[in-house]
Amino acid sequence: MSKRILYVVHRYAPYPGGSENYVRDMAEETLSRGNDVWVLSGEHKGDLNGVKLSSDYNILNEDWDLIVVHGGDVNVQDTVLFNSEKIKSPILYLLILPSNSPVCLKGLRDCKYLGCSTKADWEHLMRNGVYGKGVLVRHGIDDKISKGENGFKEKYGIKTKRMFVSCGGYWHNKAMKELVQVFNESNVPDTTLVLTGYDNRFGIKPEESEFVKPLMIDSREDVLSAIKEADLYILHSYSEGFGLVLLESMFNKTEWAGRKIAGADTMSNYGFTYTSDKELSDYMKSFTPDDSRIQRAYDYVVSERLIKNTVDDILKVIS
């Protein structure tokens, strides 16, 4: 039986960004199953691929089988969380990045369901006495659009034997400058560190050097190509909701290293996690791909971490 599902996010594809693309993937997968799917978003470019878009908060007063809020601490989501007690339709609040802000804590209290994907999510519910409202909603990627093609090294002139990659934008939490410092101090032989981002509003894009190549890239195809051709993907962020790029790395059979947070901590069996710059430096200097782990990581994504698994979990809430 068809369900009416409303997703809530601050900005929606085709704008670039992790949240924008992740909610698009969830919405389109939900639509493909014969449901009536809308998205409430502060910034969008109109209906997309059959998904209906709106910026009118009055849509919250309509009858929905489920309202799915993608995280908090941003304007549109916070408006829904703040008013969640007054909204008649059931709300699934996907924590994404656990927050102790007043509006997010209100969302924990007032929303009917709380979606968790990481160890940190479940621990946050336990600390706030709402563990019983938690439901598993696995982060996942769309396998139809997550496969990289060869060609990045040739296109961008990468001549070294090895290439380490980190993507996601030049935001303070991504710690790109700090990663460059660790890489330079490690003196990894015959290796280029490639950084990609689509936003440098803070002016913190690192300087280019012989073995460090920071790029401004809007093309998802180029980013996936970089991930596919990388010997190692590095997620050096101080904070992340999950880190979907780790799943993209695993799907493209690329090893990853990540600070022990969010998705990296949750999936530590499939990559290398660290808690200090020294641990990362030592790993880079001695890096050798583990073919067995690469295959296990790929198998895990294909069986447990695709967008169809995410939507399975969401729809299970109201089945």
Walk through the language-model features, giving the residues of each.
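Glycosyltransferase donor-sugar binding loop
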Residues: 42-45, 167-170, 192-204
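Acidic anion/phosphate-binding donor-loop and adjacent secondary structure
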Residues: 103, 140-155, 204
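A short, active-site helix/loop in glycosyltransferases that binds the activated sugar's phosphate group
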Residues: 111-133, 141-143
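Nucleotide-activated donor-binding/catalytic signature segment of Leloir-type glycosyltransferases, i.e.
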Residues: 203-221
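Short alpha-helical donor nucleotide-sugar binding micro-motif in glycosyltransferases
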Residues: 219, 225-230
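Aromatic "clamp/platform" in nucleotide-sugar-dependent glycosyltransferases that forms part
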Residues: 238
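A charged, aromatic-enriched C-terminal amphipathic alpha-helix characteristic of glycosyltransferases
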Residues: 288-318
